[in-house]
């Protein structure tokens, strides 16, 4: 494999010295970029784009051509895993993802099993293709949804505002939910390890919906299964450590518990104070975040002010990867994203070295 020309992102995740704070953006390959929209139109549908190795590679690389980012992230979707389990993923126009065969009967759940990873070969082919296209420019991040977040879509049959179906199952038939979560945890572990084998140099677990749970439920139905995955991941590849990032949206309450799961870094959403978060986790993990995606709708001056505030909040030393507190909004101005990236590089040098 090609030698990495820029490994700042990987070093920051391992709290090793860096010259500046690295940055990438969740959903950096996405609808805010006109070139992404053009490629997506060429592909036909979102799922076709995910499954076309050449086009998935193209959209992964697009933001790196425009911005001086320190990492690329595989272009895919968290719902590829339940789709491979036979749930029939489709995207309804203007409604987001849906499953044709949601898990709403005990008999469906009894039949649920870890999918054959060959059904996800298109994802691993994309990882290998992207690594080749990157040619050592920056590291490539692989990812998956968390067991609970995947279960939300699998049980609800799509997105939800109140998660009534899955919460009903959680409180009335927890045995059924345990079965789904355990299957998901095994599947995600195999899926991420296959991404690492294909060339992913770091992996992120997205727990988008963990924050809708009570304190006890988060620990029992989400964190426990993320810990299971982290324990089963390959942590070395190509002669270097493969860092693991866990991002739980709305998870700021549980940082102390999340430190215990064995990840190298925790992602923060924009509601957290990053300085307080650093004090709470001590030197145990790196932190990633946590610029409010909506702040990109501000002026160039307000974007610079917000970047400075976050960098000052984190303070001196390594262990910070700059990111948004959630995915970039589809209406964001790419020029404002460029200001964000360049400002992070410019203003962060004073916090490193010397």
Curated annotation (Swiss-Prot):
Site (described: Transition state stabilizer): 77
Subunit field text: Homodimer.
Predominant cellular place of this UniProt entry's protein: cytoplasm
HAMAP family the UniProt entry points to: URO_D (MF_00218)
Broad enzyme group: lyase
Binding, substrate: 27-31, 77, 153, 208, 326
Gene Ontology biological-process entries: protoporphyrinogen IX biosynthetic process from glutamate
EC number: 4.1.1.37
PROSITE patterns linked to this entry: UROD_1, UROD_2
Localisation per UniProt entry: Cytoplasm
GO cellular component, as recorded: cytosol
A UniProt-annotated Pfam family: URO-D
Family statement: Belongs to the uroporphyrinogen decarboxylase family.
Function comment: Catalyzes the decarboxylation of four acetate groups of uroporphyrinogen-III to yield coproporphyrinogen-III.
Pathway named in the protein's UniProt entry: Porphyrin-containing compound metabolism; protoporphyrin-IX biosynthesis; coproporphyrinogen-III from 5-aminolevulinate: step 4/4
Catalytic activity: uroporphyrinogen III + 4 H(+) = coproporphyrinogen III + 4 CO2
UniProtKB keywords: Cytoplasm, Decarboxylase, Lyase, Porphyrin biosynthesis
PANTHER family: METHYLTETRAHYDROFOLATE:HOMOCYSTEINE METHYLTRANSFERASE RELATED, UROPORPHYRINOGEN DECARBOXYLASE
Protein's recorded name: Uroporphyrinogen decarboxylase
The organism of origin for this protein: Neisseria gonorrhoeae (strain NCCP11945)
InterPro entries: UROD/MetE-like_sf, Uroporphyrinogen_deCO2ase_HemE, Uroporphyrinogen_deCOase
